[in-house]
């Protein structure tokens, strides 16, 4: 068995160039060196624009500087040559033997291949989804879930200690609206007819919860039935109420008064039901969290009051029109924000300040919030509050996720939420499957609009990217199954036999895998993994169509099987990072 330490060719080339720069330009030590993968194979395996960057600063000819740097490069066991291209790019060409021998390192590393120490064990909390527990998750939540879960996997592979957190908005007005909606549906089951508010929650799940309550409790919550309906009807038909939102708030207040302690029971029931449904939906989608953090706990623990007091102590609050305002314009926001209303109730922003204070006090090195793109305007006030609390805003990053738009038969699928006619994540998963949903959701950068083609996601064709990648994995499993040998035999591969251009391309893709994971972690970009997998699958399919594997030459057979076994290993790893299965047969 050949024992091979996993080489890092990119870092090696950077070290060579750094040593050359120290020799040619001793006064320019510590300059940052970056290497990129050239688009054209003729330009080598890695390329650097170092000479052009330094030439501008030093007022020297970039071509001459590049040649001087190449002339000063130390000898290397894995670099064949370096040359100058274009206006001063320095291109590195790896030795064929270095690429060939890399195969052994991949096979020996096994499932850990692709992992790196980029994060150096630093802790990062990734908060994502955090949907109001007021109804089933919809397809917009699904994209945030797929993005966050995939990114958490990628960050873990890149050496970060990741904590996944779901912030449960269980203390706000929306939960009161859902409780009211469920109670009104329940009253209808009790034979108490009432005009249902247009801006209440109207989905079938509301009726289902009402039915469950009625079956378990009978008419227990139909308090003072005739008087109840009269009071609710008066509010519903009043012409003195300025807006439908105010009308809904009056109905909520009436419900709390009528039900008294029973209101809390109903509130807890609908919260428990919706949270359980959300957890199950996400778990079935392959998305799990270490922490489910309750907004209500911030009030119960006094954290909200403490956060507001901290701002007050810094003279950053003032009273106006009976409300308490935060001077957020002092920190770049477009206007000041209310943290406590004139009725004494704290705003959602106040609890959000407390929540972020809690995050900082829990000691994470980095914090990443994944929000829907519609929350873009919320960023300045949150960042401002963090700065106002004398916390480091640089530790918090906010990534925005655009909503996905579904298409069926080439036509846009309509979606709404309050009416109950929306497309749920569960419905999407049932139609296209978890694998297609997870993969399609991360095919684009998170801040770009995503057109989700339902017909394509269900098709078994090479046009379907997830099918294309999974089929490559299954094809390899089929070949290895036909061979039937023990996989430890593959360690005997004679890598010098891998001379076909298609084989060298596959080896190069393997070399790129760790760099791709690191780039996806740095750029918060799971789509880079999806792109990589599509490219690797494409190169394999081309190789498969032009190559025989189970040949009579034993050495050549074992070597080719070792190569595709490594491809299978990387395909499986990449799919796992994205929460997608790697089927052995299709």
Curated annotation (Swiss-Prot):
Protein name, UniProt field: Arginine--tRNA ligase
Species of provenance: Nitrosomonas europaea (strain ATCC 19718 / CIP 103999 / KCTC 2705 / NBRC 14298)
This enzyme's EC code(s): 6.1.1.19
Cross-referenced Pfam families: Arg_tRNA_synt_N (PF03485), DALR_1 (PF05746), tRNA-synt_1d (PF00750)
Catalytic activity: tRNA(Arg) + L-arginine + ATP = L-arginyl-tRNA(Arg) + AMP + diphosphate
GO MF entry, a single one: ATP binding
Quaternary structure and partners: Monomer.
Motif 'HIGH' region, residue numbers: 131-141
Entry keyword Aminoacyl-tRNA synthetase: yes
Class in the EC hierarchy, top level: ligase
Keyword match Ligase: yes
């Amino acid at each position: 068995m050949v024992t091979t330490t996993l080489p890092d060719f990119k870092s090696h080339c950077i070290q060579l160039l750094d040593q050359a720069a120290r020799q040619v330009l001793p006064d320019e030590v510590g300059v940052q060196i970056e290497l990129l993968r050239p688009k054209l194979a003729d330009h080598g395996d890695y390329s650097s624009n170092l000479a052009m960057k330094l030439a501008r600063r030093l007022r020297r000819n970039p071509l001459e500087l590049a040649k001087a740097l190449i002339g000063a490069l130390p000898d290397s066991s894995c670099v064949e040559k370096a040359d100058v291209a274009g206006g001063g790019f320095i291109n590195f060409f790896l030795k064929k033997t270095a690429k060939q021998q890399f195969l052994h390192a991949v096979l020996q590393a096994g499932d850990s291949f692709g992992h790196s120490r980029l994060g150096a064990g630093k802790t990062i909390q990734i908060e994502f989804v955090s949907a109001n527990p007021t109804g089933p998750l919809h397809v917009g939540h699904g994209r945030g879930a797929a993005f966050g879960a995939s990114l958490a996997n990628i960050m873990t592979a890149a050496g970060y200690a990741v904590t996944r957190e779901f912030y449960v908005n269980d203390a706000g007005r929306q939960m009161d609206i859902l409780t009211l909606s469920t109670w009104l549906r329940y009253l209808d089951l009790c034979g108490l007819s009432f005009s249902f508010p247009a801006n209440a929650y109207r989905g079938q799940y509301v009726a289902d919860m009402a039915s469950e309550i009625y079956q378990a409790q009978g008419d227990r919550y139909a308090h003072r039935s005739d008087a109840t309906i009269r009071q609710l009807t008066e509010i519903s038909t009043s012409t003195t109420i300025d807006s439908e939102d105010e009308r809904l708030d009056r109905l909520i207040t009436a419900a709390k008064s009528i039900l008294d302690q029973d209101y809390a029971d109903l509130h807890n029931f609908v919260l428990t039901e919706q949270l359980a449904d959300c957890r199950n939906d996400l778990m079935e989608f392959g998305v799990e969290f270490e922490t489910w953090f309750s907004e209500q706990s911030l009030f119960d623990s006094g954290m909200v009051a403490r956060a507001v007091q901290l701002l007050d102590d810094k003279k950053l609050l003032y009273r106006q029109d009976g409300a308490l305002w935060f001077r957020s314009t002092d920190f770049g926001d477009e206007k000041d924000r209310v943290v406590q209303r004139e009725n004494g109730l704290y705003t959602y922003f106040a609890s959000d300040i407390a929540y972020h204070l809690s995050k900082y006090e829990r000691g994470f090195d980095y914090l990443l919030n994944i929000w829907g793109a519609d929350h873009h305007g919320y960023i300045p006030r949150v960042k401002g509050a963090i700065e106002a609390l004398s916390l480091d805003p640089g530790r918090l990053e906010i990534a925005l996720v655009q909503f996905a738009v579904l298409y069926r038969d080439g036509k846009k699928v309509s979606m709404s939420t309050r009416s109950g006619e929306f497309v749920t994540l569960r419905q999407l998963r049932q139609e296209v499957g978890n694998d297609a949903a997870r993969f399609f959701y991360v095919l684009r950068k998170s801040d770009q609009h995503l057109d989700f083609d339902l017909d394509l996601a269900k098709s078994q064709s090479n046009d379907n990217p997830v099918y294309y990648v999974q089929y490559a994995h299954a094809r390899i499993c089929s070949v290895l199954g036909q061979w039937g040998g023990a996989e430890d035999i593959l360690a005997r591969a004679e890598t010098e036999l891998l001379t076909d251009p298609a084989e060298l391309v596959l080896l190069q893709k393997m070399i790129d895998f760790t760099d791709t994971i690191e780039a996806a972690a740095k750029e918060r970009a799971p789509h880079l993994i999806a792109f990589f997998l599509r490219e690797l699958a494409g190169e394999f399919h081309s190789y498969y169509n032009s190559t025989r594997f189970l040949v009579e030459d034993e050495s050549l057979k074992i070597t080719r099987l070792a190569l595709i076994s490594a491809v299978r290993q990387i395909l499986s790893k990449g799919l796992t990072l994205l929460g997608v299965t790697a089927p052995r047969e299709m």
